[in-house]
Amino acid sequence: MKKLIILSALLATLAACNNLENNNQQTVSTTTVVNTLNSTSNILQGIAAYKQGDMIGAYNALKNLSPASTNLETYSTYLNVLQNLNKNQELLTALKSGSEYFGSSKDYVLNYANILTSKFNDTNTATNVLENYLKLYGNNSEVEKSLANIYTSTKR
């Protein structure tokens, strides 16, 4: 049934593209349409697998996810999958890539710092991430609390 729905959407999109060509308007390539549909399908499959607890299935569907092509909620799901599968190097790379697109989000910054401290014991980078957020976006009690927790946990 899902394949039928996707196929119907693809045919409708192709027909719309053909209609645009016939009207001498800006055209969208068939390859672009197919790639967009495949990407959307992968994201939906990945989220469904994640919600069912299938981390490997979620990883396989989301592993090519780019922060530029998604929203914060979906990207956070991808980060959770990487954490659950202990794909540490990919997780660090994804965190850094995501900060370029979601660095203005308090939730992303808090999650980033939490992962750095809890999974990698990297309090220096976590501190920098939180301090940079405060410098750019002003005071925030949650960010300040997280920063204070790092400061107190590293003092001995």
Question: What do the PLM-derived regions correspond to, one by one?
Answer:
Residues 55, 88, 122-123, 156:
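TPR-repeat structural position
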Residues 77-78, 111-112, 142, 146-149:
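Canonical tetratricopeptide repeat
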Residues 2, 11-78, 84, 89, ...:
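N-terminal leader/linker segments that initiate helical-solenoid repeat arrays
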Residues 52, 85, 119-120, 154:
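Structural motif corresponding to the intra-repeat A-B loop/turn of tetratricopeptide repeats
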Residues 64-65, 97-98, 132-133:
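Canonical positions in the second alpha-helix
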Residues 67-68, 101-102, 136-137:
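Structural marker of alpha-solenoid helical repeat scaffolds
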